[in-house]
Amino acid sequence: YVLINDKEVNGYTLDKFEPLKLLDPITEDRNTLRYSMIPSLYKVYEYNKAREQKEISIFEIGKGFYKKGEVYGEDTKLCVLMSGKYSTGLNNNKTVDFYVIKGIAEEVLDYLGYAGRYSFMKQEMPKEMHPGQSAMINVNGSNIGMIGKIHPSVTRDDVYVLEINLDELFTKKVGKMKYKEFSKFPSINKDIALVVDKKAISKDIEKVIKSAGGSLLTNIEVFDVYTGVGVGIDKKSIAYSLTFSDMKKTLTDEEINELMDKIIDAISKKCGAELRK
């Protein structure tokens, strides 16, 4: 539904809007046009949870409405909400976390032509979002959305959301699509688990890994983040899947091992990371 309670109109946003209330609402719970789509999807989540659904992944492309002074407007938005486990086709037991919702945002932005032109910024977040597990999505210097975990004051469940203002996004000039030839030689995957400071930012570590791996490192993906027994109170473990390939030949084990040693040395010196044993 595009209708929410008027008390929710300024939820999940740092902006302040006047409620766009209906003159004759059917119910007071749905008496106002929404601005953020997250309250709508959260109601769908609660409906399904009440019916014993534990693995919930939903999305919507729809409208958000606002009134600021004498200005009325509406924006087209994409909203995703996920909780529990989900199927990737490869691993049916993957638990949704910050990096899963971040990966979805990256795939959407890359597909739309914004690869390399966005970043995830740790800034002031709406009070409904967990400050330690949320970020603004910034494209060309402007915030066009956010990702993260819903604050424990709202729900004790691990619920993650993504919201992108598509109208705002599409005002940013899209880079030209370029064809990239795929290697006809097999790629090689290597996993690496690192123990780093709890406040370490994965994107910074990925930059060091990419720099050390060079052109033969074709993909980096976070597949696990762990805190708890075995990694230290002020530490966390981040596991990465690294893909290597060469356009001209099949890489040897010796070449891969040399690259891995170079990567490990770089992240140890620049990020203070240790291999998880």
Where would I find each of the regions flagged by the language model?
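Conserved alpha/beta core surface patches that mediate binding of polyanionic ligands
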Residues: 2-7, 35-83, 161-175, 214-231
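A carboxyl-terminal module marker
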Residues: 9-11, 91-277
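Residues forming anionic-ligand binding surfaces in small-molecule and nucleic-acid pockets
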Residues: 18-23, 63-92, 184-191, 235-245
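Extended, well-folded interaction surfaces typified by the phenylalanyl-tRNA synthetase beta subunit core
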Residues: 1-56, 190, 243-247, 251, ...
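Long hydrophobic segments that form regular secondary structure
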Residues: 49-52, 58, 64-71, 80-89, ...
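A general structural signal for short secondary-structure junctions and capping/turn motifs
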Residues: 30, 48-52, 68-72, 127-128, ...
